[in-house]
Amino acid sequence: MRTNKVIHVIGVHAEGEVGDVIVGGVSPPPGDTLWEQSRFIASDETLRNFVLNEPRGGVFRHVNLLVPPKDPRAQMGFIIMEPADTPPMSGSNSICVSTAILDSGIISMQEPLTHMVLEAPGGVIEVTAECANGKAERINVLNVASFVTRLAAALEVEGLGTLTVDTAYGGDSFVIVDAIGLGFSLKPDEARELAELGMKITAAANEQLGFVHPCNADWNHISFCQMTTPITRENGILTGKSAVAIRPGKIDRSPTGTGCSARLAVMHARGEIGIGETYIGRSIIDSEFKCHIDSLTEIGGLSAIRPVISGRAWITGVSQLMLDPTDPWPSGYQLSDTWPAI
């Protein structure tokens, strides 16, 4: 076999959402901080294009690059590459990364609990992995500070009129809207329409409401539209379903850890949930994250929470991505039949 490069990948999904992990073949990018390293990857695009574009990837795929941490508290760093963004944090991807590094032995597993500190571009997270029989069975992530920026804001969306929305940050930035009011019940056969409408709402929210992280002015847009059903109690436990539209136009298969964190911040701001109370976030395929508020904090003068996201991930395979020197598409390609135009 002829190849100009070999990238070693562990395939993983967390509650349905693909979050593959690069474990070899890629040098750490330049930058004094993980955020700077992630900005290099975002602007350079070489690695993103190679692993995310067809024929090696697709719009369904997220890929994480393991890097040495910059924060001395952390044992490992990771940079998240989503189809269109290189975000500060991702709940499902942090669960994929934690599972991959424990199940593969990159970090030694301790049963029944393994405690780790990982560094994402958006900050340090604490992980407690529930382990048995050589498998990380459940990953509990103490997420970064999550906060509300707007409650019950008016948003004009062409074809929909005036919507009432919330905006919040849970490791990434969200506009949150009632799905029932839009005529959806959040079923798999609604995914295409949800994705298209979500992109439309996100664009309107960026134009009219905007977002700037109080401690990181580089993150200055709303990334996702989270369409939600009302909170109910199932067997006494607060439960809610959501579908998160991810750029350039797909629906998260998992319950979206950063989305659950943002929703917890909104719920707490409204007095709907207390510290330590369990909330189950459910996805469009009915997978679940178990979440709760660990503590209250403050960030950039804003009241915030530290949420915990709990979910499962599974190894799907091990692969090597290669580039034949005669391949006419070294950066891959995107077609609008599966990769919607932003």
From Swiss-Prot:
Q: What is its EC number?
A: 4.2.1.77
Can you name this protein?
Trans-3-hydroxy-L-proline dehydratase
Q: Which Pfam families match?
A: Pro_racemase
Tell me which domain of life the UniProt entry assigns to the organism this sequence originates from. Answer: Bacteria
Function (record text): Catalyzes the dehydration of trans-3-hydroxy-L-proline (t3LHyp) to Delta(1)-pyrroline-2-carboxylate (Pyr2C). Is likely involved in a degradation pathway that converts t3LHyp to L-proline. Displays neither proline racemase activity nor 4-hydroxyproline 2-epimerase activity.
Question: Sorted alphabetically, which Gene3D superfamilies does this protein's record hold?
Answer: Diaminopimelate Epimerase, Chain A, domain 1
> Is Acyltransferase among the key words of this record?
no
Q: Establish whether keyword Lyase is in the entry.
A: yes
- Family of the protein in this entry: Belongs to the proline racemase family.
The beginning of the lineage is: Bacteria, Pseudomonadati, Pseudomonadota, Alphaproteobacteria, Hyphomicrobiales
- GO molecular function terms attached to this record: 4-hydroxyproline epimerase activity; trans-L-3-hydroxyproline dehydratase activity
Give the source species: Allorhizobium ampelinum (strain ATCC BAA-846 / DSM 112012 / S4) (Agrobacterium vitis (strain S4))
Protein keywords:
Lyase, Plasmid
Enumerate the catalysed reactions. Answer: trans-3-hydroxy-L-proline = 1-pyrroline-2-carboxylate + H2O
Signal peptide bounds: none
Residues bound to substrate: 91-92, 252, 257-258
Residues annotated as catalytic: 90 (proton acceptor)
The record's top EC class is: lyase
